Amino acid sequence: MTALPAASITSSAFDDLDALNAQLEGLHADQRVAWALQHGPQNAALSSSFGAQSAVTLHLLSQQRPDIPVILIDTGYLFPETYRFADALTERLKLNLKVYRPLVSRAWMEARHGRLWEQGMVGIDQYNNLRKVEPMRRALDELEVGTWFTGLRRSQSGGRAQTPIVQKRGERYKISPIADWTDRDVWQYLQAHDLPYHPLWEQGYVSIGDFHTTRRWEPGMREEDTRFFGLKRECGIHEDI
């Protein structure tokens, strides 16, 4: 696809999101980032789970705005490999990492509620709200984020299949610059820039969250089946905020 000149899309394009998304579909991912940084609301930030393919958006954003805040929600239940991966990428890309944690510790939450992730959909939803949604909402509010970049891709799950490049959530704009990328696009970008997958990728983990609700991919499974015992794909961050 021949990319349109980003300069031809002005700030007033936010007034018609359908038309804006149609125009942004014609841009390359780096052009989408540049356009959103120039024309989007003040205080841009990128959220990252430091998951399987997170190095793409971390590199894409940090190349254009090195000091952009990178929000990581530390649930307290991440894989040890995820913490080490976050350390390695933070050092390599000189990331401005902002770590947010739940208001209640692991031990206190389990004392109050037990192992919520083993209590069906109701328990999983409560767990996600306590350990993911609330800290992310707090991070976005405290950092006064007006333009929120994510690494969402349409091919990741059925629920993300219609992800637009830009959407409005309250007074905030949410930008997904690689929404239309395939797994091959991701691989090519990582190869081109000598960037790593998450260490657990080689062990069969294709979507990586908390250790107790993430499993290896096996033949016949969809990517979303590897999370939350196959009951759901989303943790609530990209549904409720």
Curated annotation (Swiss-Prot):
Task: Tell me its EC number(s), please.
Answer: 1.8.4.8
The GO terms this record gives for MF are:
phosphoadenylyl-sulfate reductase (thioredoxin) activity
Keyword annotations for this protein, in alphabetical order, are: Cytoplasm, Oxidoreductase
Q: Give a GO biological-process term.
A: sulfate assimilation, phosphoadenylyl sulfate reduction by phosphoadenylyl-sulfate reductase (thioredoxin)
Instruction: Spell out the HAMAP family in the cross-references.
Output: CysH
Which family would the database say this protein is a member of? Belongs to the PAPS reductase family. CysH subfamily.
Reported function: Catalyzes the formation of sulfite from phosphoadenosine 5'-phosphosulfate (PAPS) using thioredoxin as an electron donor.
- The identity of this protein, by name, is Phosphoadenosine 5'-phosphosulfate reductase
Q: What is the organism of origin for this protein?
A: Xanthomonas euvesicatoria pv. vesicatoria (strain 85-10)
